[in-house]
Amino acid sequence: MDLIDAMGGQVFHLGPGQEVINILDFSQLLSELEQIPDDITRGDAPRREAIDAMKRRRATLVTGLLELGRDARISEKERSMVVEGLRILDEEFDIEKEGRQPRISDLVALVRSRHPRLAAIAQDRGDEERYAERAELLLDGLIALTSSGVYGSIFDGDSTVQIEAGRPVVFDLSSIDDGDLTLQAAVQAVSWSFGSAVVDAEKYLADAALRPRRHYFLVMDELWRMLRASSAMVFFVDALTRLNRARGIAQAMITHTMDDLKLSSDELTTIAWGFVARSAMVFIGGLAQSEMGNLEQVFAMSAREKSMIMDWSADGSLNPHTGTQAVPPGRGKFLLKIGKKPGTPFEVELTAAEMDVNNTNRAWTTAAERFRANAARVTETLEEAA
């Protein structure tokens, strides 16, 4: 966060009582993509492709959040109802009359209304009670995303987040309680989705010569939080990263150990491990033997490489005389693996300016400084008394 701020970027604080992201509001991107001109040979196909891509991302986000809340995959019927419901809102929601973009609560109202196109997907056979039964689970999940649900107004209001293309952006989730993994995962999913959508839209606009071509890099940190909140989120992450990969968007997925990718079934674990196997480059910090997962199989790691990584995982030794702890042996050290080629070990050395804006241990550092200052005063008092 300090780094992005120092670079003149945007910092959005997400959590209860803070910024709002309307998860249905892709209007800024869609209005820009509407400006893509007809192609000489393909007509309006480039414009339609770009707009359809944004709508697919929106649908992927909504269904992903539904699966997070349910901790299981939703049915194909429910997925189809979500996609068709979003399509109906695009066609029928009167933005000028309402004075705002459609929200998730509007999708709830639409599903409740038993719109004929949704009734057809639900196969209610003209029976209102059957429709209510067929749509009940879907409505339960959608209501949870509204201001009446567990997330409050974070996703169901007018967006206060407007990402400016060309500037660094970070989403700050620090206000969310560490124990609320579901809320953390939901906000992660939304921030990753919107960040990816902005970059994707910029690439479409650059293809149409409406933007200078820029190279973006998406950082998806704390992957373990999302997967721990619900194993079903592995499908959301898989879909999102595949979309990004297909569009040539550079992305980094960061987690602590390969154990974070061991999920509730072999099928889900295989999908999660695939994130690593498909990565062009993997940067490995210190790991214990038990934390390596399938790294040995995927990257054919030598005994020397494994030994080096395990050595890096050790804690810094404590000086019994001064009470200070030595720098951990693995601080700043990584092994770069590209396929099955021998890895390249390297050490990151930060400049003074970089050290300050990358200090993620600031709270502990401040506490330690206070402790040392208090200890010094106590020692001085005891010496004076003696």
Model-derived segments and spans:
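P-loop NTPase motor domains
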Residues: 3-9, 14, 23-249, 325-328, ...
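Conserved ATP-driven motor cores of ASCE-family P-loop NTPases powering translocation/secretion/packaging/pilus
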Residues: 15-40, 233-347
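Short, exposed beta-strand "edge-strand" segments with a Pro/Gly-rich flavor and a Y/T-containing core
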Residues: 18, 86, 92-109, 167-169, ...
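Surface-exposed polar/charged interaction patches
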Residues: 92, 113-114, 148, 312-315, ...
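Short helix/loop capping segments that flank catalytic or ligand/cofactor-binding pockets
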Residues: 179-181, 228, 293, 344-347, ...
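Short intrinsically disordered coil segments
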Residues: 185-189, 299-300, 351-353, 363-369
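Extended, compositionally biased alpha-helical segments that mediate assembly or anchoring
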Residues: 329-341, 346-351, 358-386
